[in-house]
Amino acid sequence: MLPEDYEESEAPYADASQAVFATIFFVVWESDSFWLHVTTSYSQYIPSSIRNALFLVFTVAGGYMGWMAHEQIFGVAREEAELVDYGVYGLSRHPMYLGIMTVFLGLVVSTASVAAMVVLLGVFLFYHYLASYEEMKLVEFFGDRYVAYMARVRRWV
C-alpha cells in the first residue's frame, strides 16, 4: 500500500494501452495465421512438430510466469508497501510483462507469422517503456533498495 500522497506508479493509460496492444497482436496474428497467410510462408521450412513443441514450451512457461507474478503481487494482502524481489521477481523485474510476451512469442512461433512478430516487437517496446516508467517511480519510493534490486536482477532475462 502506497502513501496517499504518492503519485500513481503506473504510466498513464497503462491498462487501456495493454488491452489495445493485446487486441492488435491477436487480430494480426489470427488474421495472418488463419485467413490471409500473407507472412506465414516460413512455416513450411519449420516442421510443425517443432513449432508445436515450441508453442507449448513458450505458452506454458509464459503463462506460468505471468500467473505466478500476479499471485505474488495481488494474491497476498499487505499492510505496507513491500519490495517483492523473490520468487519469479528474483528472475526478472517484470515477470508479468515477460510472461505475456513469452505467450505471444509462442503464438508467433506456432504459425511463423512475420506480421505478428513485427507487432510483438512493438509490444516489447511498449512494455519496455512501461517498465522504465514504473522503475523510475519504484526508485523514488524504495530508493537504494530498488537500485540494489536493479543491479542484482535483470529487467527481462
Predicted regions, residues:
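Membrane-anchoring alpha-helices and their flanking helix-loop junctions
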Residues: M1-D85, G99-V157
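Conserved SAM-binding loop
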Residues: S92-R93
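Active-site His/Glu-centered metal-binding helix of metallohydrolases
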Residues: M96
